[in-house]
C-alpha cells in the first residue's frame, strides 16, 4: 500500500470513498509520523485517543453512505482555536493549562464535516511573530534544510507549527490564522499552500484574539485543491461573530482547473524593492509568464501607499493587541502570580506570563493609544489604512481581477538568525503580506520554485473581496507549472 501520509487530501478522500483504506488506518499512519517527528516541535499537544475515536466514527458514516465532505481526514489545529475539553494556550505561559468548555466555530464546522483532530499545533505566542520562535513551547523546526547543511531553519510564523506539520506530512491539512501574513509567509517558507480569506469569510468566534480588525482564519494544505476543500468547510456566516459576513460560501473546488483566459493580473511596481534578491525577482517574472501562457492578461498597476503599510500595521496591530490582552490578569483563569495587593497580582502575572515579544507589542500598543500620542500615531495609521484599501479598490475598479506579488522577501532563515538586536529586521518579513490584512482582502501563497540553496519560495496572489475562487483558479496554474515540492526527510 502507498504510504498513506504522502497522499493529498483529495487523494485520501477518494481512497476512503473507495474503501481502499480506512480512516483509522489513515489516522494511525499520521499519528506514527507525528511520533517520529517530535524533533520538529510542530505539535504542542497530541490527541491520539480522540483522533482514533473520531476516525472510527467517520468509518461508520462512510460505511453507511452518510459521510461529510472531510469524513475521516486527519487534521491539525493551531493552538489559537478553542477545542472543547482539549488544552488551548495560544502558546503562552499566561494561559497555563486552560481547557475551554466550548468549541470554536471553525473547528465545529470541521468536525461537522467529519474531520479528525490529531492534536494542537505550535504557533508564535498569541500569533505575534514571523518565525515561530516566541512560543512558550519553544521554536518549531522547518522540515526543509539548505542543501549540504544541518542548520535547522524557521518555518515562518505565526502559524509555523501548521506549515511544518503539513510540509513534513504529519497531517493532511491544518487550521491557521493570519493577522499580517501568518498563513502565507509560513506556507511560502515550507512549500505548502496557505490562503487568508477575505475578512469576515470565516468566523473568529472561539479563536484567541490578537488584532480583531485584522485576524482571519484559513487553512494550510499540501495543494491548491486541498486548501479549497478545507476553506469550504471553515467558511460561513456565524451570528456569534459580528464581523462575519452573511453571504453564500461557493464550491471553491469547482474553481480548480477553470480557464483563466482573459483574467487581468496586476503587477504592482511598488513591490519591486531595493535590494530584493535576484531569485525572488526571477520567480516573480516566471510566475507572471506562467499565468500569461495560460491566457491571463498582465498589466502594471500602482499601489502608491504600499511603503506606509508596514509601519501603519505595526501601530494598528499592537494597539488592538494591548486592548485584547488586557483580559489576561490572573484572576479568572490561567497563570496567577501572587502579590501583596490586586495591582501587584496583575503586574506579577503579566510580567511572568507574557513573553518578551508580546510584552513589547503590548507596550507599543498602550503607547500609541495614550492620550498624548493617539492622534500622532494611531489615528494617522488608520488614515493610512484607508488609503491602502483605496489603492486596491482603484486597481480593481480598472478591471484588474487579481494581483501577483512575491510572498516573502527571502527564503527561510536559521532559528535565532534574525531580530535578536533589532525587532524591525524580523518585522520586515511581512512586507509583502500586511497590505492584504490592512485592506481585508483574500490572499493565497503558492509554492513556485526554490532558491540556490534548495529552499522553497512562494508567490502571492491577492484577490477582490470575497473572490477566493479566482485565487484558487490562478493558484492552480502556478502549481501545475512549478510542480509540488517535498523536503528530504532528516528527522
UniProtKB/Swiss-Prot annotation:
The keyword Lyase does not apply. The keyword Nucleotide-binding applies. Disulfide bonds: none annotated. Coiled coil: none annotated. It catalyses: L-glutamyl-tRNA(Gln) + L-glutamine + ATP + H2O = L-glutaminyl-tRNA(Gln) + L-glutamate + ADP + phosphate + H(+). Keywords: ATP-binding, Ligase, Nucleotide-binding, Protein biosynthesis. InterPro entries: Amidase, Amidase_CS, Amidase_dom, AS_sf, GatA. It is an enzyme of class 6 (ligase). PROSITE patterns: AMIDASES. One of its GO terms (biological process) is translation. Its EC number is 6.3.5.7. The active site is at 158 (charge relay system), 182 (acyl-ester intermediate). Heterotrimer of A, B and C subunits. Belongs to the amidase family. GatA subfamily. Allows the formation of correctly charged Gln-tRNA(Gln) through the transamidation of misacylated Glu-tRNA(Gln) in organisms which lack glutaminyl-tRNA synthetase. The reaction takes place in the presence of glutamine and ATP through an activated gamma-phospho-Glu-tRNA(Gln). PANTHER family: GLUTAMYL-TRNA(GLN) AMIDOTRANSFERASE SUBUNIT A, TRANSAMIDASE. This is Glutamyl-tRNA(Gln) amidotransferase subunit A. It comes from Bradyrhizobium diazoefficiens (strain JCM 10833 / BCRC 13528 / IAM 13628 / NBRC 14792 / USDA 110). The gene is gatA.
